[in-house]
């Protein structure tokens, strides 16, 4: 029967029609996802928080609730998608900043300072408000640390390479670079999360203080 024909036995016109139909459906799905993602970013940028509902996203995007749940299992999955996209962007930006330096410690410092800056409101036209997503990542890490760690993989691997390079160059005395990378990331994330609740700017932990603390803890004499 016709339905039992293998793909190679099907008429060319049928294969072309199926391919065209799949391509159209794929493009339509991509457009719907883009609408939902755009709407979520707009809400985050306007409100400075991820405290909005699926219905808010649906209303802003012009899509339906049915379409939303065809694309995402819920709000958390949508936020995780935004987080993963922002981390990929962040990894590229961190690499570009690091590549401006040549010395191992200077490269590691550039990474640390930039990682801290990413948690701050940029105030630049066209840029997104990333801090609410960073806060979401901290909260999600308490219930799903494996998924969050996987999302941060591009950023984590870059840091690990920088630490390995610094150790190989004799600039750091670290026996376990994976643990050192985890300590540095956690210190940065905890510090800017803590800073949210401190009204006096003088009492907030700065990126420079984090760097000084880490570099001495890792057994290095920072360049003067």
Give the ranges of each region predicted by the language model:
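N-terminal intrinsically disordered/low-complexity leader segments
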Residues: 1-31, 222-224
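Generic hydrophobic, amphipathic alpha-helix propensity
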Residues: 29-40, 57, 82-86, 90, ...
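Helix-turn-helix
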Residues: 35, 43-77, 81, 85
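Hydrophobic alpha-helical connector segments
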Residues: 81, 95-125, 181-184
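Amphipathic alpha-helical packing segments from all-alpha helical-bundle domains
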Residues: 88-91, 139-168, 178-182, 193, ...
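Amphipathic alpha-helical segments used for helix-helix packing
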Residues: 119-143
């Amino acid at each position: 029967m016709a339905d039992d024909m293998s793909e190679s036995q099907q008429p060319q016109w049928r294969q072309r029609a199926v391919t065209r139909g799949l391509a159209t459906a794929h493009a339509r799905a991509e457009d719907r996802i883009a609408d939902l993602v755009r709407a979520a970013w707009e809400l985050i940028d306007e409100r400075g928080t991820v405290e909005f509902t699926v219905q808010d996203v649906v209303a802003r995007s012009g899509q339906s609730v049915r379409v939303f749940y065809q694309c995402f299992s819920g709000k958390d999955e949508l936020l995780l998608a935004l987080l993963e996209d922002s981390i990929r962007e962040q990894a590229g930006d961190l690499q570009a900043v690091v590549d401006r330096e040549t010395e191992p410690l200077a490269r590691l410092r550039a990474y640390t300072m930039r990682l801290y800056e990413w948690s701050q409101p940029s105030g630049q036209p066209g840029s997104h408000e990333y801090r609410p997503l960073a806060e979401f990542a901290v909260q999600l890490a308490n219930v799903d640390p494996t998924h969050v760690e996987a999302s941060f993989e591009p950023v984590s691997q870059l840091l690990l390479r920088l630490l390995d390079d610094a150790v190989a160059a004799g600039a750091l005395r670290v026996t376990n670079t994976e643990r050192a990378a985890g300590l540095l990331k956690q210190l940065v994330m905890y510090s800017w999360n803590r800073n949210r609740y401190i009204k006096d700017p003088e009492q907030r932990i700065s990126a420079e203080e984090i760097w000084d603390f880490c570099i001495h803890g890792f057994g290095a004499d920072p360049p003067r």
